[in-house]
Amino acid sequence: MISITEKVHGTSGISAYVLCKHPRSFANKAIAWISEKLLGLEIEGTTQYYHDYDYLYSSRSVIKNQYYNKNAGPGFYGCDVWKFADDVVRPWLQKGMTAYYEIVGFLPNGGYIQKGYDYGCIPPKEGDVYQHGVHFKVLVYRITMTNVDGNVHEFSAREVQQWCDFVNLTPVHQYYYGYAMDLYPELSLAEHWNENFLQKLANESLFYMEQDSPTCNNKVPHEGVVIKVENMKSEAFKLKCFKFLDKEGKALDKGESNIEDAN
Protein backbone atom coordinates (compact mmCIF):
# COMPACT_ATOMS: atom_id res chain seq x y z
CA MET A 1 0.00 0.00 0.00
CA ILE A 2 1.16 3.53 -0.75
CA SER A 3 -0.04 7.05 -0.14
CA ILE A 4 0.62 9.86 -2.62
CA THR A 5 0.27 13.37 -1.24
CA GLU A 6 0.94 16.91 -2.40
CA LYS A 7 4.50 18.13 -1.81
CA VAL A 8 4.21 21.72 -0.62
CA HIS A 9 6.91 24.39 -0.61
CA GLY A 10 7.11 25.77 2.92
CA THR A 11 9.23 25.34 6.02
CA SER A 12 9.28 22.24 8.21
CA GLY A 13 7.99 22.29 11.77
CA ILE A 14 7.73 19.72 14.57
CA SER A 15 5.58 19.79 17.72
CA ALA A 16 5.96 17.15 20.42
CA TYR A 17 4.64 16.23 23.87
CA VAL A 18 7.34 13.83 25.02
CA LEU A 19 9.44 12.79 28.01
CA CYS A 20 12.11 15.41 28.67
CA LYS A 21 15.06 15.61 31.02
CA HIS A 22 14.56 18.19 33.80
CA PRO A 23 17.24 19.31 36.30
CA ARG A 24 16.16 18.97 39.92
CA SER A 25 15.98 22.00 42.19
CA PHE A 26 18.35 22.06 45.19
CA ALA A 27 15.58 20.98 47.55
CA ASN A 28 14.45 18.25 45.18
CA LYS A 29 18.02 17.00 44.81
CA ALA A 30 18.24 16.70 48.60
CA ILE A 31 14.96 14.80 48.81
CA ALA A 32 16.03 12.47 45.99
CA TRP A 33 19.42 11.84 47.64
CA ILE A 34 17.83 11.04 51.02
CA SER A 35 15.22 8.81 49.39
CA GLU A 36 17.80 6.83 47.41
CA LYS A 37 20.87 6.79 49.65
CA LEU A 38 19.38 6.75 53.16
CA LEU A 39 15.94 5.22 52.73
CA GLY A 40 16.83 2.85 49.90
CA LEU A 41 13.88 3.95 47.79
CA GLU A 42 13.85 3.81 44.01
CA ILE A 43 13.65 7.25 42.43
CA GLU A 44 12.75 8.29 38.90
CA GLY A 45 15.82 9.48 37.00
CA THR A 46 18.83 10.35 39.15
CA THR A 47 19.54 12.62 42.09
CA GLN A 48 20.46 15.33 39.56
CA TYR A 49 17.56 15.13 37.12
CA TYR A 50 14.17 13.54 36.46
CA HIS A 51 11.99 12.85 33.42
CA ASP A 52 8.56 14.31 32.82
CA TYR A 53 6.37 15.07 29.83
CA ASP A 54 6.84 18.48 28.30
CA TYR A 55 6.13 20.29 25.06
CA LEU A 56 8.85 20.87 22.47
CA TYR A 57 8.71 22.57 19.12
CA SER A 58 11.35 22.91 16.45
CA SER A 59 12.20 23.69 12.87
CA ARG A 60 13.62 20.91 10.71
CA SER A 61 16.83 20.77 12.79
CA VAL A 62 16.74 23.32 15.64
CA ILE A 63 14.78 23.09 18.91
CA LYS A 64 13.13 26.48 19.35
CA ASN A 65 12.13 26.34 23.06
CA GLN A 66 14.61 28.72 24.66
CA TYR A 67 14.52 26.94 28.02
CA TYR A 68 15.83 23.80 26.26
CA ASN A 69 18.00 25.54 23.67
CA LYS A 70 19.41 28.79 25.03
CA ASN A 71 20.95 29.54 21.64
CA ALA A 72 17.59 29.43 19.87
CA GLY A 73 16.92 32.64 18.00
CA PRO A 74 14.10 34.03 15.87
CA GLY A 75 15.47 32.21 12.83
CA PHE A 76 16.03 33.01 9.19
CA TYR A 77 13.50 35.83 8.87
CA GLY A 78 13.81 37.35 12.33
CA CYS A 79 10.46 35.98 13.54
CA ASP A 80 9.51 32.69 15.15
CA VAL A 81 6.90 31.34 12.72
CA TRP A 82 7.40 27.90 14.30
CA LYS A 83 5.93 29.13 17.61
CA PHE A 84 2.77 30.26 15.83
CA ALA A 85 2.48 26.85 14.17
CA ASP A 86 3.11 25.07 17.47
CA ASP A 87 0.27 27.06 19.05
CA VAL A 88 -2.04 25.51 16.44
CA VAL A 89 -0.90 21.91 16.93
CA ARG A 90 0.05 21.73 20.63
CA PRO A 91 -3.49 21.64 22.14
CA TRP A 92 -4.22 18.35 20.34
CA LEU A 93 -1.10 16.40 21.29
CA GLN A 94 -1.41 13.45 23.64
CA LYS A 95 1.47 12.26 25.82
CA GLY A 96 4.13 10.69 23.63
CA MET A 97 2.87 12.24 20.39
CA THR A 98 5.01 14.09 17.84
CA ALA A 99 3.51 15.86 14.81
CA TYR A 100 5.50 16.82 11.71
CA TYR A 101 4.15 19.46 9.36
CA GLU A 102 4.84 22.08 6.72
CA ILE A 103 4.17 25.77 7.42
CA VAL A 104 3.13 27.62 4.27
CA GLY A 105 1.96 31.09 3.29
CA PHE A 106 3.28 34.25 4.87
CA LEU A 107 5.37 35.29 7.88
CA PRO A 108 4.23 37.63 10.67
CA ASN A 109 6.25 40.43 9.04
CA GLY A 110 4.37 40.03 5.75
CA GLY A 111 7.09 38.25 3.78
CA TYR A 112 6.65 34.94 2.03
CA ILE A 113 7.67 31.76 3.82
CA GLN A 114 8.79 30.64 0.36
CA LYS A 115 8.89 33.34 -2.31
CA GLY A 116 5.79 33.33 -4.50
CA TYR A 117 4.11 30.36 -2.80
CA ASP A 118 1.01 31.75 -1.06
CA TYR A 119 -1.11 28.57 -0.79
CA GLY A 120 -4.27 30.63 -0.64
CA CYS A 121 -3.03 32.85 2.20
CA ILE A 122 -2.77 36.63 2.27
CA PRO A 123 0.07 38.70 3.81
CA PRO A 124 -0.70 40.33 7.16
CA LYS A 125 -0.78 44.10 7.16
CA GLU A 126 0.77 46.27 9.84
CA GLY A 127 -1.34 45.96 12.98
CA ASP A 128 -3.01 42.70 11.91
CA VAL A 129 -3.15 39.75 14.29
CA TYR A 130 -1.24 36.90 12.62
CA GLN A 131 -3.90 34.24 11.99
CA HIS A 132 -3.76 30.58 11.09
CA GLY A 133 -5.81 29.82 8.01
CA VAL A 134 -5.60 33.43 6.86
CA HIS A 135 -1.94 34.42 6.82
CA PHE A 136 -0.37 30.98 7.18
CA LYS A 137 -1.36 27.32 7.16
CA VAL A 138 -0.09 24.24 8.97
CA LEU A 139 -0.24 21.02 6.93
CA VAL A 140 0.43 17.82 8.91
CA TYR A 141 2.18 14.99 7.08
CA ARG A 142 3.49 12.65 9.78
CA ILE A 143 2.65 11.60 13.36
CA THR A 144 4.46 9.30 15.77
CA MET A 145 3.69 8.01 19.27
CA THR A 146 6.59 7.22 21.63
CA ASN A 147 6.00 5.20 24.82
CA VAL A 148 7.91 5.50 28.10
CA ASP A 149 10.42 2.87 26.94
CA GLY A 150 11.28 4.91 23.86
CA ASN A 151 9.53 2.61 21.38
CA VAL A 152 8.08 4.58 18.46
CA HIS A 153 4.82 3.81 16.65
CA GLU A 154 4.47 5.36 13.21
CA PHE A 155 0.95 6.44 12.24
CA SER A 156 -0.10 5.18 8.84
CA ALA A 157 -0.84 7.77 6.15
CA ARG A 158 -4.54 6.99 6.57
CA GLU A 159 -4.33 7.45 10.35
CA VAL A 160 -2.68 10.85 9.83
CA GLN A 161 -5.60 11.92 7.63
CA GLN A 162 -8.16 10.54 10.11
CA TRP A 163 -6.51 12.09 13.17
CA CYS A 164 -6.34 15.51 11.52
CA ASP A 165 -10.00 15.25 10.58
CA PHE A 166 -10.89 14.25 14.16
CA VAL A 167 -9.08 17.21 15.80
CA ASN A 168 -9.87 19.69 13.00
CA LEU A 169 -6.29 20.14 11.80
CA THR A 170 -5.33 20.12 8.12
CA PRO A 171 -3.30 17.25 6.66
CA VAL A 172 -1.36 17.44 3.43
CA HIS A 173 -3.69 16.80 0.50
CA GLN A 174 -3.83 13.12 -0.38
CA TYR A 175 -4.10 12.32 -4.10
CA TYR A 176 -4.08 8.53 -3.91
CA TYR A 177 -4.23 5.74 -1.33
CA GLY A 178 -4.03 2.10 -2.38
CA TYR A 179 -1.81 -0.43 -4.08
CA ALA A 180 0.84 0.98 -6.39
CA MET A 181 0.07 -1.57 -9.09
CA ASP A 182 -3.60 -0.51 -9.11
CA LEU A 183 -2.73 3.09 -9.98
CA TYR A 184 -1.54 2.08 -13.44
CA PRO A 185 -2.96 -1.42 -14.04
CA GLU A 186 -1.91 -1.29 -17.70
CA LEU A 187 1.76 -1.56 -16.72
CA SER A 188 3.30 -5.01 -16.89
CA LEU A 189 4.86 -6.18 -13.62
CA ALA A 190 7.36 -8.20 -15.66
CA GLU A 191 8.66 -5.36 -17.85
CA HIS A 192 10.61 -2.64 -16.01
CA TRP A 193 7.62 -1.86 -13.81
CA ASN A 194 9.50 0.44 -11.39
CA GLU A 195 10.92 2.65 -14.13
CA ASN A 196 7.63 2.78 -16.04
CA PHE A 197 5.65 3.56 -12.89
CA LEU A 198 7.89 6.51 -11.98
CA GLN A 199 7.83 7.81 -15.54
CA LYS A 200 4.03 7.84 -15.61
CA LEU A 201 3.84 9.33 -12.12
CA ALA A 202 6.29 12.10 -13.05
CA ASN A 203 3.88 13.25 -15.76
CA GLU A 204 0.57 12.53 -14.00
CA SER A 205 -1.81 15.41 -14.71
CA LEU A 206 -4.23 14.20 -12.01
CA PHE A 207 -1.50 15.01 -9.49
CA TYR A 208 -0.60 18.31 -11.24
CA MET A 209 2.88 17.13 -12.19
CA GLU A 210 4.70 19.66 -14.41
CA GLN A 211 1.81 22.08 -13.90
CA ASP A 212 1.25 25.18 -11.79
CA SER A 213 0.52 24.70 -8.10
CA PRO A 214 -3.16 23.79 -7.66
CA THR A 215 -3.31 25.35 -4.18
CA CYS A 216 -1.53 28.68 -4.77
CA ASN A 217 -3.23 31.79 -6.12
CA ASN A 218 0.06 32.83 -7.70
CA LYS A 219 1.24 31.18 -10.90
CA VAL A 220 4.16 29.11 -9.58
CA PRO A 221 5.36 25.57 -10.41
CA HIS A 222 3.85 22.71 -8.42
CA GLU A 223 6.61 21.22 -6.28
CA GLY A 224 5.63 17.57 -6.75
CA VAL A 225 4.41 14.63 -4.71
CA VAL A 226 5.45 12.50 -1.74
CA ILE A 227 5.07 8.73 -1.93
CA LYS A 228 4.80 7.03 1.47
CA VAL A 229 5.04 3.27 1.81
CA GLU A 230 2.63 1.79 4.36
CA ASN A 231 5.02 -0.47 6.30
CA MET A 232 4.93 0.99 9.85
CA LYS A 233 8.24 2.75 9.12
CA SER A 234 9.10 6.33 8.27
CA GLU A 235 9.67 5.54 4.62
CA ALA A 236 8.72 8.26 2.14
CA PHE A 237 10.07 9.44 -1.19
CA LYS A 238 9.83 12.83 -2.89
CA LEU A 239 9.19 13.19 -6.60
CA LYS A 240 9.71 16.81 -7.62
CA CYS A 241 8.58 18.43 -10.85
CA PHE A 242 11.31 19.43 -13.31
CA LYS A 243 9.69 22.88 -13.65
CA PHE A 244 10.02 23.37 -9.89
CA LEU A 245 13.62 22.14 -9.84
CA ASP A 246 14.46 24.51 -12.70
CA LYS A 247 12.95 27.46 -10.81
CA GLU A 248 14.77 26.46 -7.62
CA GLY A 249 18.07 26.14 -9.50
CA LYS A 250 17.73 29.60 -11.03
CA ALA A 251 17.03 31.07 -7.58
CA LEU A 252 20.19 29.44 -6.20
CA ASP A 253 22.19 30.79 -9.13
CA LYS A 254 21.00 34.28 -8.18
CA GLY A 255 22.17 33.72 -4.60
CA GLU A 256 18.68 33.78 -3.13
CA SER A 257 18.51 32.31 0.38
CA ASN A 258 16.08 29.65 1.53
CA ILE A 259 14.47 29.44 4.96
CA GLU A 260 15.04 25.66 5.03
CA ASP A 261 18.79 26.06 4.51
CA ALA A 262 19.11 28.10 7.71
CA ASN A 263 16.81 26.11 9.98
Protein language model annotation of sequence segments:
Residues 1-263:
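Core nucleotide-handling region used for phosphoryl-transfer chemistry
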